From Swiss-Prot:
This is Bifunctional protein argC, mitochondrial. Keywords: Amino-acid biosynthesis, Arginine biosynthesis, ATP-binding, Kinase, Mitochondrion, Multifunctional enzyme, NADP, Nucleotide-binding, Oxidoreductase, Transferase, Transit peptide. Transmembrane segments: none annotated. GO terms for molecular function: acetylglutamate kinase activity; ATP binding; N-acetyl-gamma-glutamyl-phosphate reductase activity; NAD binding; NADP+ binding. InterPro entries: AceGlu_kinase-like_sf (IPR036393), AcgluKinase_fam (IPR004662), AGPR_AS (IPR023013), AGPR_type-1 (IPR000706), Asp/Glu/Uridylate_kinase (IPR001048), NAD(P)-bd_dom_sf (IPR036291), NAGK-fArgBP (IPR041734), NAGK/NAGSA (IPR011241). GO terms for biological process: L-arginine biosynthetic process. GO terms for cellular component: mitochondrial matrix. The keyword Kinase applies. It is found in: Mitochondrion. The lineage of its organism: Eukaryota, Amoebozoa, Evosea, Eumycetozoa, Dictyostelia.
Length: 847
């Protein structure tokens, strides 16, 4: 680290003729002229370093092979037990699209005290496209039964000692608890099956010490495949059987993790009553990085018995699963917050990140060279890799890379005899230094070794912003900005001078031919006739649906997904049902024009909260870039410069515009219902609405708290609601709107009462709607029935029906999905129209 933190030095920096700024790692900034420079140094850079999110590799949980079938591929081998037996099972099954497997281990305490929230959590997972496989425990219940029978409850290293008398009681208790979960799921409308035996094959672990406790040697997945085929949630008890048919007890944590090794689920969730894993002070640990913390944790005096067993099994499991796999420990009522909120309240256990230098025994030269090609765009052996290999062996240059080979660097001595190294080049898997936090782990590795310095063109705003976050000091100038780490203050002056004198990169000296095209030009050339779009505010429920629809679009490519909360993380951490290597960027108002240019963006989806998007739009208005903008907030629904994005009634105007104000969710239903009768109203119509709690967003609040909403609805903002003002403005006629939140997850129902100028019959009303929305595939007119929320949930359509007429009094019931036609579907319709594409591309396949 920098020493002499209170000492100031002055230096003359040549070739920089304008006012410069210097920043130290205590965040103080000193202005200085080109002839006199004051550089302050100190400590604190490590407080800026965030934990790295691992690169997500493709997970083989469900692979679609046709519209009506899929293949579930389980791992071909497992490890972690002494007697390892090959496990191989593959079966083609009929399965719904978007289904991804999540392994859920449920503690016995949850079954006993919080089964209602538990069932809500499992149903929530299914709602967002994740299919749970449940493994349950029953420790508290078994202990109670043993006490009643006069049997002692004994444990050795966290494992229950199981003599024949205990095993007999355990089988009865586990069956009872299994059926509790199954029956509760069935009562909630979710199909479930008990799987009490037949999944685990085992041998006795140590009969003299543990009795009838098993060591899992094989996983049988026939029962699981059968359940998934028929859309049943399998509920598995932690009992195994020997090849000869002897029943053995398996610790539920061990059972769940052994199953995870074999099926490689998209996510692993441990649901317990403590909402996480607690440390010695009784506080929940938010993150555990096993590669970094395991050895120290196992030495802690509070790590014993069950906790010690958990950590041991967590490591055994994560060591054999893809590096991106994590285990989330939370409670039923906090599951949604843990999955979606910025500050989850449970514990996330990850394998962590290991860094390699080119001198490390595990350094993979081939993978590192592939990373260079991926990052620099070199093809056909233009870089002389044999020369690079030789120079690495001689120490002419040094290489550092993360264990997933998604981020790396080349460094070389700043000058002969210098203790400071010059960072010659950065390499990133997806060609964007700003779109990954892997670079932070690379720098952490650098900090452990020596002092480093590098420079960047002052014009490269995106890179400079990133480097400022990870450097202990920097100076900015008209031509170049200089960044450094861990340089003593008495060496900074000379180091800066020597850094400025570096004229070319190492790779440029061993490259046979270089492309003259810029990165953005090459990107535009390689677009393959797909329009490139970006999504700002890419998190939560609406963002997930937009990402999914874009992912399945034949003519669109999601080039950027921006989220300040998730910056650098794989997009699958927010939307686990997707299969994508994309990582979150952090697009800001001051750099959206640069992102637009450098990434060849044809259109932006702005999924930001109200009153946030304007600075982004102002930057684009002041630049030469003119992408299509579809804003899902309410910011521009009252702005005449923007086009109201209601395709069924405003298609021609949308086609000629690049600024689209996407209608609100409730507003879509009210507008479409009232539009055919807007000229026939005597008084303002009254609109009573109930929305699912997903409409309150993924940030926890009373309006999306399932406990508060249980057997309840919550009215809110009953006058002057934004959607009331929006629809009144767009119709040119006032309305009244009374919104409520219900206990269901997604969907909207509206009951709208209108007083007309003249009497009408039901037949006349139905005919009016049918003519008005003829040839509109997303508008359904139900002339005889009453639309229900559950019938329209998960669909792209609006259903108008429930017609009740009494003279000139008309009541209409309308339903729609607030996340789809009320948000993502309509936004995609608008983007398709603006780009000249099929309006229903990526939508019609799901109708």
């Amino acid at each position: 680290m920098l020493r002499n933190s209170n000492k100031l030095i002055k230096s003359v920096i040549k070739n920089e003729s304008t006012l410069l700024k210097c920043k130290n790692n205590n965040q103080r900034v000193v202005n200085y002229s080109s002839s006199s420079t004051s550089i302050t140094s100190g400590n604190g850079i490590y407080s800026q370093i965030k934990k790295i999110e691992e690169f997500v590799s493709k997970k083989p949980s469900v692979t679609k092979v046709s519209s009506s079938s899929a293949t579930i591929n389980f791992n071909t081998s497992k490890s972690g037990s002494t007697n390892t037996t090959a496990v191989d099972y593959s079966k083609s099954v009929k399965i719904k699209d978007q289904k991804q497997i999540v392994l859920v281990k449920i503690g016995g305490g949850v079954i006993e005290s919080d089964i209602s929230s538990l069932i809500g959590s499992l149903n929530f997972l299914k709602k967002i496209g994740l299919f749970p496989i449940v493994v349950h425990g029953g420790g508290p219940q078994l202990n109670a039964e043993l006490a009643a029978a006069g049997e002692p409850a004994e444990y050795v290293e966290g494992l229950r000692v199981t003599p024949p008398s205990v095993l007999a009681i355990a089988q009865r208790v586990f069956l009872r608890e299994n059926l509790k979960i199954v029956e509760a799921l069935e009562s909630s409308g979710t199909k479930a099956r008990p799987v009490t035996q037949g999944v685990y094959q085992a041998t006795p672990l140590d009969p003299k010490l543990y009795g009838f406790v098993g060591n899992v040697t094989k996983i049988h997945t026939d029962a699981l495949a059968s359940c998934i085929t028929n859309d049943y949630v399998p509920v598995i008890s932690s009992l195994a059987m020997t090849p000869e048919g002897q029943v053995l007890n398996i610790n539920a944590d061990v059972a769940a993790l052994e199953l995870a090794k074999s099926i490689n689920p998209l996510k692993i969730l441990f649901i317990n009553t403590t909402a996480g894993m607690k440390d010695g002070d009784g506080k929940v640990m938010q993150h555990i990085k096993l590669d970094e913390q395991y050895a120290d944790l196992m030495k802690q005096p509070w790590v014993k018995h069950g906790t010690k067993l958990k950590l041991k099994e967590f490591k055994s499991c994560l060591d054999v699963l893809p590096p991106s796999t994590s285990i989330t420990i939370t409670s039923p009522d906090l599951l949604m917050k843990e999955l979606f909120a910025k500050d989850g309240s449970g514990t996330t256990v990850e394998r962590g990140e290991v860094m390699h230098s080119h001198e490390s025994p595990s350094f993979d030269e081939t993978k590192f060279f592939a990373l260079i090609e991926k990052s620099t765009g070199t093809k056909g052996g233009r870089i002389d890799y044999q020369q690079l290999k030789t120079d690495l062996s001689k120490g002419v240059v040094k290489a550092f890379v993360n264990s997933h080979y998604t981020a790396g660097i080349l460094v070389r001595p700043l000058s002969s005899g210098s203790s400071v190294s010059y960072v010659d080049q950065f390499f990133f898997f997806n060609n964007s230094i700003q779109s990954t936090e892997d670079s932070e782990s690379v720098f952490k590795k650098m900090f452990e070794n020596s002092s480093y310095i590098w420079k960047e063109s002052s014009n490269n705003q995106l890179n400079n912003e990133w480097f400022k976050k990870i450097a202990t000091g920097f100076i900015t100038g008209a031509t170049n900005n200089i960044f450094w780490t861990n340089i003593d203050t008495n060496k900074i002056e000379n180091s800066i001078k020597e850094c400025l004198s570096q004229s070319s990169t190492y790779l440029s000296g061993i490259t046979k031919a270089a492309s003259s095209k810029s990165a953005s030009e090459k990107l535009l050339q390689d677009k393959n006739h797909k329009f490139r779009v970006g999504l700002i505010g890419a998190r939560g429920f609406t963002g997930g649906n937009l990402v999914r629809l874009i992912d399945g679009h034949p003519n669109l490519e999601l080039a950027i997904a921006s989220s300040s909360t998730n910056f650098g993380k794989p997009i699958t951490t927010e939307f686990p049902q997707l299969k994508s290597n994309l990582k979150f960027d952090n697009v800001k108002p001051e750099n959206i024009d640069i992102f637009t240019r450098d990434h060849g963006i044809d259109g932006w989806f702005m999924a930001l909260p109200d009153k946030i998007s304007s600075p982004y739009i102002q930057t684009l208005e002041n630049s030469s870039e003119s992408p299509v903008l579809v804003d899902l907030s309410s910011d521009h629904r009252f702005n005449e410069k923007w086009t109201y994005g209601q395709p069924e009634t405003n298609r021609a105007a949308i086609k000629e515009s690049k600024l689209i104000a996407n209608p609100g969710c409730y507003a879509t239903g009210m507008f479409l219902t009232l539009k055919p009768f807007v000229n026939d109203l005597v008084t303002p119509p009254s609109c009573f609405g109930i929305s699912g709690y997903s409409g309150a967003g993924s940030k926890p609040s009373e309006k999306n708290d399932p406990t508060r909403l249980s057997d309840n609805i919550l009215p809110y903002k009953l006058v002057q609601h934004t959607h009331e003002l929006e629809v009144s403005h767009q119709l040119g006629s006032p309305i009244y709107f009374m919104p409520h939140v219900g206990q269901f997850f997604q969907g909207i129902t509206l009951t709208i009462s209108m007083e007309l100028k003249y009497p009408m019959t039901k037949e006349q009303v139905v005919e009016r709607y049918q003519k008005f929305y003829q040839n509109e595939p997303l508008i359904k007119i139900d002339k005889d029935g009453i639309p229900e929320v559950k019938s329209n949930s998960g669909k792209h359509t609006v259903t108008i029906g429930g017609f009740a007429v009494n003279g000139n009094h008309l009541v209409v019931v309308t339903t729609l999905d607030n996340l789809l036609k009320g948000a993502a579907t309509q936004a995609l319709q608008n983007m398709n129209i603006c780009l000249g594409l099929d309006e229903l591309a990526s939508i019609k396949n799901e109708l």
